Amino acid sequence: MEGLKKKIFGVCLKNDLAQTRNETKGIHYGLMTLETSKQLQEFLHLLVIKREVIQNFELLFHIINVAVKITDSNLPSDDIWHFILKLRFSSEINIDEDSKVLNYLLETGIAMENPVSWKCLAVISSILSSVPQSKKIITNLIETEHAKKIGQLFDNIQDLQQGNFLVEILSNCFKKSASNSKKVEKIPQLWQSRSKNKFFFENEFYPFSSKNGSLQTCQFLCNNFMSTLSFTGILRQVSYSGSETLKNLRIFKKKDDENSYFIQCIYNKIYLWLDEKAPLEFERKKIRITKNLKNKIQIKLRQPFHECVRTTADKTALLFNKTKGFQLEFEDEKLGETFFHNVNNIPKISEVQNFLVLDYIEEEPENEGEEEEQIGRADEQKEDEEEESLDELSTPMVYPIKSSIPHNHNEKVQLVTPDRSVSIRSDEWDLKSNTEDEEGNVLADLKISSTKETKRQTDYVHIDSEDQSPVVSAQMRKMRRESTKTLEILRQEFKDKDVQNKEDQSEQIQNPFVNTSSLVVGKSCLVNPKEKPNIDQTVVGITELKSNSSIKKRDINILDTIFGQPPSKKQKQFHKKEKKKQQKKLTNFKPIIDVPSQDKRNLRSNAPTKPKSIKVSKLRTDKKVTGEKSSPETAAEKVDDQTVRSNDEQAMSRATKEKCFPDVNEGKEITKDDAKVSLESKKNNETFVDSSVVEKHTPPDKDCNNCNITDILESTTVIDLQSPHGLSAPGQNTFTNKLQEQIYSSINHFSNELVRKISIINQELNKKILKELSEKYQKLFSELQDNFQNDTNEMLKFMGEIKDMMNLPEDQLVHAIRTRKFDNNKR
């Protein structure tokens, strides 16, 4: 032991009841290495085995100091602290009033986010119970030096173990006057607020001379600091088993049946508090955490208990010596699910948990005067563009490093992301000045609201030119030039379009649009409809209103490419699908009555057939008999018939219907071109009607033989045909209604049955998969993980043995590598 002391500390420290001395004199620590860690572990192991009692705080100070430095160097230190917590102290040990050992332990113990803080407090707790004279010194250190730091720790406490030992120390140093009383003899000023100190120490759950891990201590922490304690849960029941499948579970019981258990996952370890002595410390890498079908969490040990779990309670370690796993039942199932999710989703090293808030990005003030000044600066930069030199562009930019704590006036300022980026001010196109033509007429369709322009001004984030780099300024000037050039091109295009629109207006007035919706498809002849006066003026007026607008489809498409997205074709496809559905539904109709003759007549047609690629609608047309050309009066009457349906057309006499039987002729496909429909209709003396218009025109003054009965119907229209026997249509409608009801009911019944069977299949499959397959594959995956872990461990061991093979000849080296096996440590 003496040799180990000299290797570790540089001097041979004595463990005797000596007088107080300078505890740090003549000792200088060098770089901590793995060898130092092993030597200290061996030294502490000998102290524990030989049951040595610490009689000098100088030795304890250097042991704690070296252990903390080894931990800070990320060297293996768990076993070192395990042996430190098992050290025993003499009750006659000499303690100075300003003991550096206790001060150092307190300072390290109340540090936040330190994995060994609670272990330093555990050492103080052990000294407090073993050395009676230490209580006065610890109380004085807390009041004078560490009170404020303890208050800050409780405001942000995360470690349940640290809180347990700290509350134990406080409850023994600042006791209640009685177990049932709320008064404390002397309250330390942990916070500046008296009410906060009073609430902490005079709380009904504040323990009376408690021990760490007791029910009072844990309840006090959970009731007051549960929101800050990370990954902490309260358990109702803890069971353990000696089998790997956790069968034949045994329930862990205390003397007091009302006690609860507490668990926390922190610093890549799991701490389970079962009694008042010490927690069970599980190594996260050496256990596997799962959940069974009853939502109970299971902790399975990958290795023997003493290799996976550490505890200073010898009786507890002896009880669980042959344990292979634990089963935990939480008081709150939701809390258990949260704990299970957090334990199995530990943040990786590369995962971002915090971020810095930059406070030097300021929004542009809303004052208009300041905006004008900023615009003036931009214009000055544009004029001085040619005067910039390469030396200015090559000068390094030095940006000040700001504090990560934002100021009050910039609390809500965020960095500009690509989705929220503001466009350059020069990208705002003033189309209002371009919408006026030469005659002063304003295009009605081009209206840009001022709200959009104001929104851009308020959202615009200004960055001062002093903070910009020359490269960024040059790029912004380039973008301004490009946008200005684009605006000039757009203005020229609008001027050219205005000239073309005026020429189109004159042509349209000379050749008015001939509306042919009043043409009626009759039996086999066409006659000139009744003349109506004063139609030319109406047609010219309508044409002027329609042609007055200079906006065409091409102009709208240009604006869509600038400000919006290309028009979707869903609407056209929807109309086509709707027409197809109507066609399919009505062409399958079969009337009940017998019609003498429904054969389609082969009629001639002088109308040219349009190509199918630009098909608009399908109409039923009859052969044109008369060769007369339609006059302007006829065209005028057609326009009138399209706008208003007359009362004479709606009231058709039954006598006329009985004498004249219009035949259902074959429908012909007629297409319409947007640019040439009016000219071709006038030359060929025929009309093209939209499929959505259905009109009937029959002059009541003339006989059926001398008139033209016209029915403009869709290809899917059902004509009310009358048989010679005079059967009526209501019977036919009743039959179709009943047939539709039967079809609907049968389809509805079939769909309901199908949905019910599918739901049954889903439920049964889910149950079968959860019960039978989940446990099977969980076991397979766990075995796979174990095998993979064993193989990797064997590979690491083999890599460590390579250095011993460097002295072998080549043949023996190849033979040794090839014969090496990674199964059960066999070669």
Curated annotation (Swiss-Prot):
Entry protein name: Protein RED1
Coiled-coil blocks: none
Positions with biased composition (Acidic residues): 364-373, 381-391
Name of encoding gene: RED1
Alphabetic keyword roster: Meiosis, Nucleus, Sporulation
Function: Probable constituent of the synaptonemal complex during meiosis. May interact with HOP1. Required for meiosis I chromosome segregation.
Claim: Nucleus is one of the keywords in the record: yes
Region described as Disordered: spans on this chain: 364-393, 563-655
Basic residues: bias regions: 569-584
Domain of life: Eukaryota
Pfam family, one: Red1
Location within or outside the cell: Nucleus
